[in-house]
Design a protein with these regions (language model features):
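Alpha-helical transmembrane segments and their helix-start/interface "positive-inside/aromatic belt" motifs
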Residues: 1-16, 89-97, 155-156
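N-terminal transmembrane-helix/juxtamembrane module of multi-pass inner/ER membrane proteins
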Residues: 2-72, 110-142, 232-239
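Membrane-embedded catalytic cores of phosphoryl/pyrophosphoryl-handling enzymes
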Residues: 2-8, 133-239
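Alpha-helical transmembrane spans of integral membrane proteins, capturing the lipid-embedded, hydrophobic core
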Residues: 17, 63, 67, 95-104, ...
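Aromatic-anchored segments of alpha-helical transmembrane domains
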Residues: 18-23, 100-105, 180-192
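Transmembrane helix-loop junctions in multipass membrane proteins, especially transporters and channels
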Residues: 27-29, 82-84, 111-119, 192-197, ...
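Membrane-water interface at transmembrane helix exits
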Residues: 40, 44, 74-78, 106-114, ...
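Interfacial segments of alpha-helical transmembrane regions
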Residues: 72-112, 207
Length: 239
């Protein structure tokens, strides 16, 4: 591993730790608390003011809507997949498998980080502040609350995808991943299922700390090469 890679790992870890501690150490999360409150109530009040916005937020917070995010991620990978020769196609499949394994590993780590943080809808309800629940206003079964919102698992998954795009497919792919990450993470924030900092602090710091060791060390490439050598693949010459 080169000195440049080591520097990048140290930088990513330093930013991740500093970001997390800026939220975790201050009493009541310091300046992040006022930002969280402002973001939540900005969107929450608009649920009552705009019927279109209400149903837009409701629609994007159906569990099934997560499939749309998955489909967009798959389309990006397929775009690069069909540009490759047979060997390149096999490599992209191995990159995808490695990314999936990394996501599972981070999810398992996430479960160990039990912060017991209520979503803003539940938090403000508990302290008797009026809150609009998307599920109550529409009668739809949507994601608008959580008893363990930090760190945001939805945001972490999208950030991992973006990190892999940046590492293996370049800047344009990374930009596409960032756009997806913002759009699909925002839906949970607008519904009140997550705080802004669940994603901006929790998901981001978790991915900076974990993916730097996966993608900036030989770890990911080692797994990819092992998969290329061990797995049987169809003949992609006709694709």
């Amino acid at each position: 591993m080169s000195a440049k890679k080591l520097y990048q790992i140290i930088l990513c870890n330093s930013i991740g730790i500093a970001l997390f501690l800026s939220w975790y150490l201050p009493v009541d999360h310091g300046f992040w608390a006022s930002m969280d409150r402002a973001v939540f109530f900005y969107f929450n009040q608009h649920l009552a003011e705009s019927r279109f916005f209400l149903y837009f937020v409701a629609f994007t917070n159906f569990r099934a809507f997560d499939l749309v995010a998955g489909a967009c991620m798959l389309l990006i990978l397929l775009y690069y997949f069909f540009q490759q020769n047979s060997e390149g196609k096999r490599r992209i499949i191995c990159i995808f498998i490695t990314m999936a394994l990394s996501t599972v590993a981070v999810k398992l780590l996430d479960r160990q980080l039990d912060f017991h943080r209520l979503s803003p809808t539940l938090y403000f309800t508990n302290i008797h502040e009026p809150v609009n629940f998307v599920s109550e206003m529409t009668g739809w079964n949507v994601k608008d609350s959580s008893t363990a919102s930090f760190p945001g698992d939805h945001g972490a998954m999208l950030l991992i995808f973006t990190a892999f795009l940046a590492r293996y497919f370049g800047r344009k792919a990374c930009l596409a991943g960032m756009i997806l990450c913002i759009l699909f993470s925002l839906s949970r924030i607008m519904s009140g299922a997550h705080w802004f900092t669940d994603v901006a602090v929790g998901s981001l710091s978790l991915v900076l700390l974990s993916m730097s060791w996966v993608l900036l060390t030989p770890a990911a490439n080692t797994v990819i090469k092992w998969l290329e050598a061990k797995l049987l693949f169809p003949n992609f010459k006709n694709f």
